């Protein structure tokens, strides 16, 4: 499932994104955020983080720097 999500995001980056003007108000862009989130957290949590990020991408949100959260190690505070 992780590879499938990564394939969808890469397809978007290669074939769809170049056809649109650059409008992402975040850094990293939503597609780069999605790739990193899925690679770091897997399909379910990474997919959820990506969906939350895309829902914030609208004209009324200021945008800015919004990196993927660091993965927490078990047993460490």
Curated annotation (Swiss-Prot):
GO terms under cellular component: plasma membrane
Membrane topology, record value: Peripheral membrane protein
Chief place where the protein resides: membrane
Key words of the record: Cell membrane, Membrane
Location relative to the cell: Cell membrane
Record-linked InterPro entries: Membr_insert_effic_factor_YidD
Function: Could be involved in insertion of integral membrane proteins into the membrane.
Similarity section: Belongs to the UPF0161 family.
The protein's name: Putative membrane protein insertion efficiency factor
Organism the protein comes from: Geobacillus sp. (strain WCH70)
């Amino acid at each position: 499932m992780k590879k499938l999500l990564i394939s969808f995001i890469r397809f978007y980056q290669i074939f769809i994104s170049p056809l649109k003007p650059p409008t992402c108000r975040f850094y990293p862009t939503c597609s780069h955020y999605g790739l990193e989130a899925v690679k770091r957290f897997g399909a379910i949590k990474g997919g959820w983080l990506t969906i939350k990020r895309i829902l914030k991408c609208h004209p009324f949100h200021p945008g800015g720097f919004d990196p993927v959260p660091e993965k927490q190690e078990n047993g460490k505070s």
